[in-house]
C-alpha cells in the first residue's frame, strides 16, 4: 500500500518542477504579456471576460459599497488584472487595491512591468503582484505581503482566476485553493473561475493526449470545476461553457471566431473552449 503513495509524491513533485520550468521561461513571458500575446486573449479581456467581471463586480457591490479589493490568483504576467483595473476606472468604480499572485517569480516580475507600462499613475498605486502558490494562497500571500493571515481573512470582495484552476486539479489540491479563496473573501464576496473546457474537441484530441502524460493533460469537467467551491461553502451562481476564440488567435482568426460565435452557441455551446464557474460566499 505504501509503494503507490510514494510514486504519486514523486509524480507530483515532477509535475511541479515541469510547471515551474515552463512558466519561468521566456516563452511564457511572451505568451502572457500584452504586446506579444495573441489578439484573441487581448480581445477577450476587453469584451467576453470584461462582461463576466462586470456582472461579478455588480454582484459584489450589491452587498457592499466600499472601494473594491480584488485578487487574481494565477495571474501570469498580469494582463487580466490590468484589464480589470482599467475597466473599473472606465466604469467609475472605486478600487482600494488589486493584487495578483503567481507561483512564477519571472511572471510576477513581468506583471509589475506591465502595470508600469499600461496603467496611469493613480491606478498603478492600487496594483501589486506577489509570488504565491494557488494551493497555499492564504499562507503565501501573508508571507509575501508581510501581513498576518488574520488581517487577510475576509479582506477581499472579488477573487478570480483564468486558466489556472485546472493545475490545482492535476496536482490534487483544488479543495485547498477553494478553501483559501473562501477564507480570503468577505461574506457576499464573489469568485470567478475561467478555464479550459474538457468537452472542446481539440482539448480532447488523441494527438494532445499522445504528447502529454495523462495527469498533465487532464482537464476537469464543469461539474469538477464547481465541486471544490461548493464543498468550501460557496453558493454557485453560474456555471456554463462559453468562448470560441483561442487566446493565441491572430486578428483574422479572432474575427472569424467572433462571426461564428452566435451559431456555435446556438448549436453546440457545451463544446465551447472555456468553462465558467461564478460563486458567492454567503452574506
Region spans (language model):
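Acceptor-substrate binding/catalytic loop of class I
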Residues: 168, 208-224
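Class I SAM-dependent methyltransferase SAM/SAH-binding core
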Residues: 79-140
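A conserved beta-strand element that flanks and buttresses the S-adenosyl-L-methionine
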Residues: 160
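A short glycine-rich, Lys/Arg-flanked "PGG" loop and its adjoining helix->strand segment in the class I
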Residues: 175-187
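Conserved beta-strand signature within the Rossmann-like core of class I S-adenosyl-L-methionine
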Residues: 188-195
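Class I SAM-dependent methyltransferase "Motif I" SAM/SAH-binding loop
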Residues: 74-78
